[in-house]
């Protein structure tokens, strides 16, 4: 009898363990934060002054495929700079990424996830000798935390590490690091949960 009662309790609680977002949700994620970009061999070669911290932003359009798997397309934007004044080398990066993540742990109001992805970085380099394009492939891994704020809004904290480099300075033998760490926080909008009144259902469902 006790076993049957416990089973009934677990079945009744199952929808509450869905995590954030829930299965079948479409998602829009807005994130902003700081990039830590090591200057590496390029900075050692040129001796250019370089700050470690720079702003970074992400916009994600995704879909919760099942209770644990979430994927989508992300658009990223970041800034970087080497040197000062008229001779500075300024970098603007626009990234197009395919991303997939899976839940490591989840409850009724949160999801801890790990993910990764691949994409392309469109890098515009501004320098005294003239602007140039130095595009590059990019790959990343991530670890994050999503938590419920309201029925269709959640918070997100994410740390990711990207690998990417580009020949941004023709006068140097080493490439410029376009990757590094990105720590962001923001919000996720999720909609069309199976429990929502407006969610599409099968005929007769």
Report residues per predicted region:
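Short glycine/proline- and aromatic-enriched beta-strand/turn motifs that initiate or cap beta-hairpins
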Residues: 18-65, 118, 182-205
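N-terminal signal peptide c-region/cleavage motif recognized by signal peptidases
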Residues: 13-15
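Predominantly the C-terminal beta-signal and adjacent terminal strand-loop region
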Residues: 41, 48, 74-77, 141, ...
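Structural motif
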Residues: 27, 111-113, 154
């Amino acid at each position: 009898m006790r076993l049957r009662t416990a089973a009934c309790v677990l079945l009744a609680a199952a929808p509450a363990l869905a995590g954030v977002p829930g299965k079948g949700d479409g998602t829009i994620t807005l994130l902003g934060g700081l990039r830590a970009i090591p200057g590496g061999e390029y900075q050692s070669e040129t001796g250019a002054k370089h700050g470690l911290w720079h702003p970074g932003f992400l916009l994600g359009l995704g879909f919760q495929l099942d209770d644990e798997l979430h994927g989508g397309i992300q658009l990223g934007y970041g800034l970087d700079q080497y040197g000062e004044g008229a001779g500075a080398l300024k970098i603007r990066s626009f990234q197009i990424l395919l991303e997939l993540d899976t839940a490591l742990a989840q409850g009724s109001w949160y999801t801890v996830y790990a993910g990764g992805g691949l994409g392309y970085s469109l890098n515009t380099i501004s320098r005294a000798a003239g602007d140039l394009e130095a595009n590059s492939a990019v790959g990343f891994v991530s670890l994050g935390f999503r938590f419920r704020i309201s029925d269709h809004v959640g918070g997100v904290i994410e740390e990711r590490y990207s690998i990417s480099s580009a020949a941004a300075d023709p006068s140097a033998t080493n490439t410029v690091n376009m990757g590094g760490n990105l720590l962001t926080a923001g919000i996720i909008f999720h909609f069309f949960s199976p429990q929502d009144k407006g969610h599409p259902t099968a005929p007769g469902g």
